[in-house]
Amino acid sequence: MYAPGGAGLPGGRRRRSPGSSALPKQPERSLASALPGALSITALCTALAEPAWLHIHGGTCSRQELGVSDVLGYVNPDLLKDFCMNPQTVLLLRVIAAFCFLGILCSLSAFLLDVFGPKHPALKITRRYAFAHILTVLQCATVIGFSYWASELILAQQQQHKKYHGSQVYVTFAVSFYLVAGAGGASILATAANLLRHYPTEEEEQALELLSEMEENDPYPAEYEVINQFQPPPAYTP
């Protein structure tokens, strides 16, 4: 009797069919968290560039809007002379700018981890547990807190130096403040997308890596099985 050709390979090894040669691998990339991360980066960069951070009304200050761009580098002496701000307010706005820069760096690093999905254990843990996104959220919350503090200081200064006696003085938040709040919200969404995603266990990852290495080290090409299937059976021998 004879065995039909193509049933197996020498040494009793069987090959996977061509349609099922790919192993199910868990990609480390995450588009669901990369998109909110990109929105967070854009919002923080726009908030830094936008001059409107606080609206001022009713004081002697000739400016109606103040922002962190007014205190980066050279500070116009007229802002201090017109009682638009004081040295403490300048320091607070610079601290706000510093936290915005840190938020951009953290959000950018989180975005790169989500897009490229590195396999290094430390980077993998950092991405899966969304450490960079969480830091971005904390920095946005810090910026919001310092912004409120700066608005209270500016409001107190404007009330001491009203434009007219009996003028209504108020200070409100402008575009940049809400952009930072939106960046924090986007980072929260990115954090949720990473933390709620299902990942394989360590044993499952090791099994997938072992199967992948076995396939890569298989010396028999895929064409061997196809050719072997069409070989004629050997001649009958009694």
Curated annotation (Swiss-Prot):
Residues with the N-acetylmethionine modification: M1
- Modified positions (Phosphoserine) in chain numbering: S17
Protein's cellular compartments: Cell membrane; Cytoplasm
Q: Does the keyword Phosphoprotein apply?
A: yes
GO CC annotations? early endosome; plasma membrane
One biological process term in Gene Ontology: regulation of TOR signaling
Compositional bias (Gly residues) spans?
1-11
Q: Which GO terms describe its molecular function?
A: small GTPase binding
The UniProt annotation puts the region (Disordered) at 1-27
**Short name of any one Pfam family annotated for the protein:** TMEM127
Q: How does it sit in the membrane?
A: Multi-pass membrane protein
Membrane-traversing stretches: 96-116, 130-150, 169-189
Q: Does the keyword GTP-binding apply?
A: no
Q: Keyword set for this entry?
A: Acetylation, Cell membrane, Cytoplasm, Membrane, Phosphoprotein, Transmembrane, Transmembrane helix, Tumor suppressor
Function (record text): Controls cell proliferation acting as a negative regulator of TOR signaling pathway mediated by mTORC1. May act as a tumor suppressor.
User: Which PANTHER family is this protein grouped with?
Assistant: TRANSMEMBRANE PROTEIN 127 (PTHR28358:SF1)
Q: Which family does it belong to?
A: Belongs to the TMEM127 family.
Entry protein name: Transmembrane protein 127
Taxonomic placement: Eukaryota, Metazoa, Chordata, Craniata, Vertebrata
